[in-house]
Amino acid sequence: MVKNLSQLKKTLKKGTCFEITGHCRPEYVGQKRKVTVANTQGFYSIVPEEPGCKVTLANNGKGSVLWWSNAPFWRFEDGICSVYCSDKQHTKEFLIMSFRIMEQEVA
């Protein structure tokens, strides 16, 4: 289970799958994603089950990007990794995305 940002950066590598449990855009909740690129600046992810999806097609096929923020913008609780647009208020109002790392790969 990921407990901090350093562990998350080591865990999210190409091929890692995760499920979105909360998002600033509610239509993305429940979506299963697969990391295509991860580096020191952030990570890109696609929806492997939907090759024509706008998330998958974004950034020339690398997928949607989430840039790493500093540690105070993150919260790690009960296997859920959450990033917020505030380093002080970790509430739904400031949520960018929450997700859990999946044990098995998605398609």
Each predicted region: which residue ranges?
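Generic hydrophobic/packing signal
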Residues: 16-18, 33, 98
